[in-house]
């Protein structure tokens, strides 16, 4: 493995950032420098940091797609999970000690069930709106799969391992479950309905569970009907108990322009009074959508929720909560009407100490025997898609694409991670080993509208090809914007064909979802290729970035598939 300047940076040495296409230096947009001395040292992103280092934070605390977040607490430790739909592994598990700085520590699901059903991409299906709880030294996560029912996994360590998913309640359209262990030992579950599968929506129900919270034993009881209370599209239920009241937190009004309501009752089955407690108001924080209430050891209450930011997905916000007359008031309630507005900057939670700044990892040197936790596949993975190597690279074996292939939407072996914010550069070093079969390895920014730059073999030459696709889920054909053969070039002082060396693929991601790709043969001079393209969100998720290695079906090409070696992937 060639330890050039970028590799040293991948070892978490100081990075200085610039968005210039023709040089490889970097600086954090927040003015903070990234320093990472090893795997046990806090990783700090060079592109987005919420903690301002002065006792305050800015929202979003994670400017990445953590949809439908939920949080549980164990002492001074907080654990968060979020919707992952059909990304595998799924159910990301993040840890924090101050609710602002978060580290990705594992996943709750390593394989989606039914296994064969999710062996191919099922965009927008899978894991919806999980609920994480800690009870009697066990961690529980419940979620709804709108096509199969409500599942759960358990663990004694939130970093894993977690049990295999077990079906708690079968049915179509059952979503957004939340579990409550009551003071008398009884267990209850609330959930909502997906109208696309069940034919009903905007309502929340509660039913009693068995003592192990493994299956329901009581009838569904309607507790909130948003259809008659002006809270259409009510969903995302979270069930709590505080000071003798039962509370159901839920968003209504839709993801983009909705609000937060809270229903409360002295009795588990109601009747429930309903109140709006958080709305956009005159801020630029649209939505404020579903999330989780948590209380620190110091007695402070906080609400973590998401904001829909289109191509970035559903980013994570943190708002203070004040309890007034038994009702939570979220954010800042300037006019005293009981409904707050979300904050942009605020004093950090009182957790009794000051902790290091930390963010989820983005870059990867592929020096570990396991994939970095930031990566996930587009479907249940198959053996042979990827192998870490003792030589310090990731080997991606080409997967034959479908005979009906027109774009990447239904390719299962896309290795992707979340877009970390709306301005950054991602660069990767790849080598392609082809067996004459038009294999290709690519860097992609993926969504319903996507763009990619690939290195491929065709007609005895290696080519760089820049493509984009609009409305990929509709089966639209890719458009080729540039196709460039790689030839020996004295400018790079490479005596042989460039594909025998590493080829460096780069994308500069800009506000508005704009992408400019470039390439280099020496990792010093980068040349733009193709055109600036606009990408969009996927099905219920933001755009993602990552890698792929594919080949035409053998029945078409008559050739054996090849492979690619990925040396590193740097985000700055």
Predicted regions span which residues?
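Short, Lys/Arg-enriched N-terminal segments with co-localized hydrophobic residues
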Residues: 3-9
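Sec-dependent signal peptide recognition
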Residues: 9-16
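C-terminal motif of bacterial Sec signal peptides marking the signal peptidase cleavage site
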Residues: 22-24
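Carbohydrate-active catalytic/glycan-binding domains of CAZyme proteins
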Residues: 26-572
């Amino acid at each position: 493995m060639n330890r050039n300047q970028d590799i040293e940076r991948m070892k978490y040495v100081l990075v200085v950032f610039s968005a210039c296409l023709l040089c490889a230096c970097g600086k954090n947009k927040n003015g903070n420098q990234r320093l990472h001395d090893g795997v046990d040292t806090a990783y700090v992103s060079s592109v987005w940091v919420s903690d301002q280092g002065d006792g305050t934070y800015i929202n979003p605390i994670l400017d990445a797609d953590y949809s439908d977040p939920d949080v549980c607490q164990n002492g001074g430790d907080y654990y968060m999970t979020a919707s992952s739909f059909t990304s595998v592994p799924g159910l990301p598990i993040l840890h924090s000690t101050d609710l602002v700085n978060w580290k990705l520590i594992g996943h709750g699901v390593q394989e989606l069930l039914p296994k064969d059903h999710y062996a191919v991409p099922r965009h927008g299906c899978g894991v919806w709106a999980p609920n994480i709880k800690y009870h009697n030294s066990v961690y529980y996560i419940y979620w709804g799969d709108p096509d199969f029912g409500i599942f759960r996994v358990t663990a004694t360590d939130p970093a894993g391992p977690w049990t295999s998913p077990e079906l708690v309640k079968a049915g179509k359209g059952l979503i957004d479950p939340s579990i409550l262990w009551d003071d008398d030992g009884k267990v209850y579950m609330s959930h909502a309905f997906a109208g696309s599968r069940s034919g009903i929506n905007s309502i929340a129900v509660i039913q009693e569970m068995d003592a192990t919270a493994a299956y329901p034993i009581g009838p569904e009881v309607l507790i909130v009907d948003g259809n008659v209370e002006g809270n259409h599209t009510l969903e995302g239920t979270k069930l709590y108990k505080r000071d003798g009241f039962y509370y159901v937190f839920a968003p209504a009004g839709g993801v983009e322009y909705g609000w937060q309501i809270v229903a409360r009752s002295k009795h588990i089955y109601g009747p429930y009074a309903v109140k709006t407690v958080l709305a956009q108001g005159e801020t630029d924080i649209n939505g404020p959508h579903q999330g989780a209430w948590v209380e620190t050891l110091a007695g402070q209450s906080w609400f973590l929720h998401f904001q829909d930011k289109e191509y970035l997905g559903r980013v994570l916000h943190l708002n203070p909560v004040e309890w007034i007359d038994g009702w939570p008031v979220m954010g800042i309630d300037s006019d005293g009407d009981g409904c707050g507005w979300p904050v942009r900057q605020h004093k950090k939670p009182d957790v009794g100490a000051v902790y290091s700044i930390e963010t989820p990892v983005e870059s990867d040197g592929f020096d570990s025997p396991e994939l970095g936790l930031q990566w996930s596949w587009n479907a249940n993975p198959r053996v042979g898609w990827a192998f870490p190597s003792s030589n310090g690279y990731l080997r991606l074996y080409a997967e034959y694409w479908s005979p009906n292939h027109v774009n990447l939407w239904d390719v299962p072996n896309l290795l992707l991670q979340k877009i970390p914010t709306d301005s950054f550069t991602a660069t990767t070093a790849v080598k392609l080993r082809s067996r004459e079969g038009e294999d290709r390895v690519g860097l992609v920014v993926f969504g319903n509208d996507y763009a990619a730059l690939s290195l491929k073999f065709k007609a005895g030459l290696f080519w760089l090809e820049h493509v984009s696709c609009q409305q990929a889920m509709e089966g639209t054909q890719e458009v080729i914007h540039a196709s460039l053969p790689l030839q020996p070039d004295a400018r790079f002082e490479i005596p042989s064909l460039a594909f025998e060396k590493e080829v460096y693929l780069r994308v500069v991601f800009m506000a508005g979802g704009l992408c400019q790709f470039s390439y280099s043969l020496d990792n010093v001079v980068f040349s733009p290729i193709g055109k600036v393209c606009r990408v969009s969100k996927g099905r219920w998720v933001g755009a993602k970035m990552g890698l792929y290695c594919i080949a035409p079906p053998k029945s078409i090409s008559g050739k054996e598939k090849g492979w690619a070696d990925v040396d590193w992937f740097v985000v700055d």
